UniProtKB/Swiss-Prot annotation:
A motif (Nudix box) lies at residues 159-180. InterPro entries: NAD-cap_RNA_hydrolase_NudC, NudC-like_C, NUDIX_hydrolase-like_dom_sf, NUDIX_hydrolase_dom, RNA_Hydrolase_NudC, Znr_NADH_PPase. It comes from Erwinia tasmaniensis (strain DSM 17950 / CFBP 7177 / CIP 109463 / NCPPB 4357 / Et1/99). Divalent metal cations. Mg(2+) or Mn(2+). Binds 1 zinc ion per subunit. GO terms for cellular component: cytosol. Its EC number is 3.6.1.-, 3.6.1.22. HAMAP family: Nudix_NudC (MF_00297). It comes from the Bacteria. Substrate binds at residues 69, 111, 124, 192-199, 241. The gene is nudC. Signal peptide: none annotated. This is NAD-capped RNA hydrolase NudC. Residues 125-248 form the Nudix hydrolase domain. A divalent metal cation 1 binds at residues 158, 178, 219.
Length: 261
């Protein structure tokens, strides 16, 4: 999997360490290893984009180390591949020693895994499933400002799946815990790898069923029902939250134009 990068290796380059990524001029570097000063590094091919290889090099550069969020408005396939590189880099960084016996780990030569030659344990990259749900009530959508978002953005509700839960149970629990309402008519929409740090966002739409909004102030600053044509500041394009909101707005508009509720 990992080998020495030679001068003629070319394509797109994910250079990552501690959740940061090398973004000279705000872009994912593209070109051959020689011109980018990457020849001689250890690297792995992690995918392909626009017919060219995407490479991962685990490490940092003196300048221009930034956040993957800077690529949110780029092609979604490129964003996912860059996110894959960041997650793999962090996985290998955090699995240098075996959690069972404490001996040094070795990277597998055939798959994305770390191996312990002493106790034979095998570790794979962990992914944390997370639900995210847009809730509609007539021509309104439930939006909330989270405590972790101090930029005024309002978004839909989300939360991590707990041990032993189904995705449907997680939706019901998270919505109740954060807003004190019940939902019905749950529909799967899409999913999005979200490497902040290693989530898989599983997106749903749902309809309001019962209850009055009462927020968990450890999680939310504010929450309310907003008409589809009078929305607050929203998450950026490229996020699954924005996709859910836009899909709900389209549904609200279509049903209102048809005289439905």
């Amino acid at each position: 999997m990992e080998r020495e990068i030679v001068s003629i290796d070319a394509g797109w380059w994910v250079v990552s360490e501690e959740h940061k990524i090398w973004l000279p001029a705000g872009e994912l570097p593209h070109g051959d290893a020689a011109s980018l000063g990457l020849a001689g590094s250890s690297g792995s091919r992690i995918g392909e984009w626009q017919g060219e290889a995407v490479w991962l090099i685990r490490g940092s550069r003196p300048d221009d180390m930034g956040s993957l969020r800077q690529l949110l408005d780029r092609d979604s396939a490129l964003f996912r591949l860059a996110g894959r590189g960041i997650q793999l880099a962090e996985f290998f960084r955090s699995h240098q020693w075996c959690g069972y016996c404490g001996h040094k780990m070795h990277n597998s030569r055939t798959e994305w895994a770390c191996l312990c030659h002493h106790c034979r344990q095998r570790y794979y990259p962990q992914i944390a499933p997370c639900i995210i749900v847009a809730i509609r009530r007539g021509a309104e959508i439930l939006l909330a400002q989270h405590t972790r978002h101090r930029n005024g953005i309002y978004t839909v509700l989300a939360g991590f799946v707990e041990v032993g839960e189904t995705l449907e149970q997680t939706v019901a629990r998270e919505v109740m815990e954060e807003s004190s309402i019940k939902v019905k008519n749950l529909r799967y929409v899409t999913s999005q790898p979200w490497p902040f740090p290693q989530s898989l966002m599983v997106a749903f739409m749902a309809d309001y069923d019962d209850g009055e909004i009462s927020i968990d102030r450890k999680e939310l600053i504010d929450a309310g029902w907003y008409r589809y044509d009078a929305l607050p500041l929203l998450p950026p394009a490229g996020t699954v939250a924005r996709r859910l909101i836009e899909d709900t707005v389209a549904l609200c508009r279509a049903q209102e134009e048809n005289g439905e509720r």
